[in-house]
Structure formats: structure tokens, C-alpha cells
Amino acid sequence: MKITYKINIYNLLTYLLVFAIIKPYFLPAGLRQASKIIILISVFLFTISREKKERIVNLSWLFSGCVLLSAVMAYLKGGYHDKDFLDALLYVVTFYDIYSFIGLCKQKDRFNETIKCLYNIVGLYCVLTFVSILLVGTVNNSNQSAYIFGNKFTSSYLFIFFVALYGASHEMILWKNKICYIALFISSIALTLYIGCATATVTLAVLFIATIVPFQK
């Protein structure tokens, strides 16, 4: 009996885009950079090949253009080395890719599926991060490669992203989802307190308060 698997290109590119942005630090630096470049170019080409011509130039160009202009000026004045300038270019492409690819998914009625894909991959990242925190502890966790996906700041922000994605991908009118949502908030706050990331703790606390306090018009 032959078993076939269908891989949706939008889902695949969503997973790859997250991998390009949040790379595991156990990989060699050269491999991380090369994979990021390949993925960003692939997402860029895929997006502009399927996007309407009038939508290729969008609002993301405003921010990306400012970053690119400042990078060029810094490079010409000697403030940036070649690596710094390359990082700035990749940042520009990353911002454009995220904005334009999500917009394309919205047009193709794939936005909810994209959110679910983001929830799944970020959830996996959080599980791996939690394991690495248990193994490494909190000593010198400001170091960029302290945990599997970066230092205490990057690791904490992953959990903020995950909590937000849970709220976006689940129906909050259901009590079981509300309970899980609150549990995620509490556990994430506890984790950020443990590894000493005050900014993430405050952010999660504010989001939690905003979630439980009813909005008054």
C-alpha cells in the first residue's frame, strides 16, 4: 500500500521563515547565516511571484527603506563593516518577507492556518527552550548562546509570542481554552522570573491584566 504525503507550500514556508528568524545556536554560525539567506530569498521570490503587482510595493517598504538608508550611510561613513551591512540587508528582507507573506496568506484565505502553523512551530521552540533551561540553568544566561535559541531575552520573548499565538488560534469563549490560556500566562511568568528576564515578566503581566480586565467603551 503506497502512502503519499502532501506538503502545503504556505505551511512549509511559514515553518522555514520562523527557522530563519529564530535559529538554533547549536548549528555553526556559517550554516545559520547561509540557511537564513536561502530561506529569506525563497520566501521573497515566492511572495512576489504570487502577489498582485500593485501589492508588491507595500507599507513595509517605508520601514525597510529607512533601515536600508541608515545602513548605507553608516557603511559609507565607516561605522558599519561588511558583516554589519549584510545583517542590515537581511533585516530589511526579513521585515518585508514577514509583512508581505502574511498579507499574501490573508489574501489566499490562509491566515488562520498560518497562525496555527506559527503556534505549532513556536510551541515546539518553547518546549525545546524549556528543556535547555532545565539543563543549563541560569548561570551566564545573558550570553547569546546560553540556551538553544539564544539568551534569556530571546528565550523569554518566545514564550510571549507563544501565549499571544495561543490566544489568536483558540476560541476564548470555551472555558477549557480560557483555563489553558491563564495557565500559560502563569507558567510563562514563572519561567521568566526564574531566568531573570524582567522585561518579559512585566510584558506578560501587563498582557495578562489586559486579558482578564473587560474592555470598557
Where are these regions (language model features)?
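Hydrophobic transmembrane helix bundles of membrane-integrated enzymes that assemble
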Residues: M1-K217
